[in-house]
Amino acid sequence: MKKLRWVLLIVIIAGCLLLWTQMLNVMCDQDVQFFSGICTINKFIPW
C-alpha cells in the first residue's frame, strides 16, 4: 500500500512539472516581461 502512495506522488509531481513547463513556454511565446529571465534559463534546460 505504501508503494502505491509513492507512485501516485511521483505521477502527480511529474504532471505538475509538465504543466509548469507548458505554462512557461506559453508565457515565453507572449514575451511577458516578468518571465523573460526565467525564459532565458528555460532555453538552456532541454525539456
Swiss-Prot record:
Pfam family name, one: MgrB
Main location: membrane
InterPro entries: MgrB
Keywords assigned by UniProt, alphabetized: Cell inner membrane, Cell membrane, Membrane, Transmembrane, Transmembrane helix
Domain of life: Bacteria
Function recorded in the entry: PhoP-regulated transcription is redox-sensitive, being activated when the periplasm becomes more reducing. MgrB acts between DsbA/DsbB and PhoP/PhoQ in this pathway. Represses PhoP/PhoQ signaling, possibly by binding to the periplasmic domain of PhoQ, altering its activity and that of downstream effector PhoP.
Identification of the protein by name: PhoP/PhoQ regulator MgrB
Organism: Klebsiella pneumoniae (strain 342)
The organism's taxonomic lineage, starting at the top: Bacteria, Pseudomonadati, Pseudomonadota, Gammaproteobacteria, Enterobacterales
Gene giving rise to this polypeptide: mgrB
